[in-house]
Design a protein with these regions (language model features):
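Short, small-residue-biased leader/transition segments that mark boundaries at the very start
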Residues: 1-8
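Ferredoxin-reductase
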Residues: 15-98
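A generic structural signal for residues embedded in beta-strands
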Residues: 54, 102-103, 253
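Short, surface-exposed secondary-structure boundary micro-motifs
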Residues: 57, 105-106, 256
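Short, Lys/Arg- and Gly-enriched loop/turn segments at beta-strand edges
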Residues: 60-67, 107-117, 263
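FNR/FR-type flavoprotein reductase catalytic core
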Residues: 89-242
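Local cysteine-cluster metal-coordination motifs and their immediate loop/turn environment
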Residues: 138, 216, 238-268, 302-313
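Short Fe-S-cluster ligation motifs
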Residues: 261-265, 269-314
């Protein structure tokens, strides 16, 4: 009888027949690039809030990336990549005309705000998005979708400094009001996204819903503020992912005291119910082999790579 490994090998052989060409590459800032990938099936089915997992070559690591935009007519999907390791360095080195080995998706659940079944309720809300750094990429398609469906939203974009600011013009075109802030005060409001939100509330602005996307520490402190302000808050969790189907257990979270997996249950969750401290601690542990072994011991049946099938050992 054939095992699971044989199934994965057959799937890999099938996928190798289809490559995913890079039709556009653009530098957004130092170590941050945008790519348009020809991926007809993903482009046809994806919605804001979902993500893909890409591989540059047969031996490359699986890299989860949020869908930043899509064009169903051109059959392209836009991703934004920041170099943080060998896998993203390899991807950054590719040029227009080159191809990715794998481009699997769409994965995860679409944003609850960007679903037509919820549209009438969404139209009643005054929404503010807070994008922290690379979190700008997943915020953009949501705000764009809302504008196309008659829903206005304010957007706060936060960056460490003006040199890594990107998508200002694109966001300005779809947001009702755009507020840009930098930690060092080199551009826009001097402060972070939470401080900008507090300033807006102090000035008399009211919001029924906040969507915060960015580094975990940024989302944690945004949620502490919005809980105090009694603003329901959605976060998009970005823990380590390997297979994107819930098998590997890398993206395990605790939400409202229950185990959830960001890749299949999310990536969006009620920010006021997420255990951010546990998620950040776990993310640090997962970066080392010793840490993965400790998590495997503590979590038992949850898989933590090394099987040779899911790619967690690559």
């Amino acid at each position: 009888s054939r095992g699971l490994g044989d199934v994965y090998k057959r799937q890999d052989l099938t996928r190798r027949k289809t490559m995913y060409p890079i039709v556009r590459k653009e530098k957004l800032a130092d170590n941050i690039i945008l790519m348009d990938i020809k991926a007809p099936r993903v482009a046809k089915e994806c919605l804001p809030g979902q993500f893909i997992i890409a591989k540059t070559d047969e031996v490359g690591e699986r890299i989860p990336l949020t869908i930043c935009d899509y064009d169903r007519e051109k059959e392209t999907v836009t991703i934004v990549v920041q170099t943080i390791g060998a896998g993203t360095e390899r991807m950054m080195a590719l040029n227009e005309g080159d191809s990715l080995e794998d481009f699997v998706g769409p994965l995860g659940c679409p944003s609850e705000l960007c679903q037509e079944d919820n549209l009438e309720e969404t139209k009643k809300k005054h929404i503010v998005f807070i994008a922290g750094g690379l979190g700008t990429a997943p915020v953009y398609p949501q705000v764009k979708w809302l504008k196309e469906h008659g829903v206005d939203a304010d957007v706060i974009m936060g960056f460490r400094n003006k040199d890594i600011l990107f998508f200002e013009d694109e966001m300005k075109a779809v947001a009702k009001n755009l507020y840009v802030c930098t930690d060092d005060g080199s551009y826009g409001f001097h402060g972070n996204g939470s401080q900008q939100l507090q300033a807006l509330v102090d000035a008399g602005n009211t919001y029924d819903c906040c969507v915060a996307i960015g580094p975990m520490i940024m989302m944690k402190f945004t949620c502490l503020l919005t809980k105090k302000l009694e603003i329901p808050t959605i976060v998009s969790m970005n823990p380590i992912m390997v297979d994107g189907t819930g098998m590997c257990g890398a993206c395990r979270l605790i939400v409202d005291g229950k185990v959830k997996f960001a890749c299949v249950d999310g990536p969006e969750f009620d920010g006021h119910l997420v255990d951010f401290d546990q998620a950040m601690k776990r993310q640090q542990q997962y970066k080392t082999e010793e840490g993965r072994a400790k998590l495997a011991y503590e979590e038992g049946a949850t898989h933590h790579g090394g099987c040779g099938n899911c790619g967690g050992d690559k």
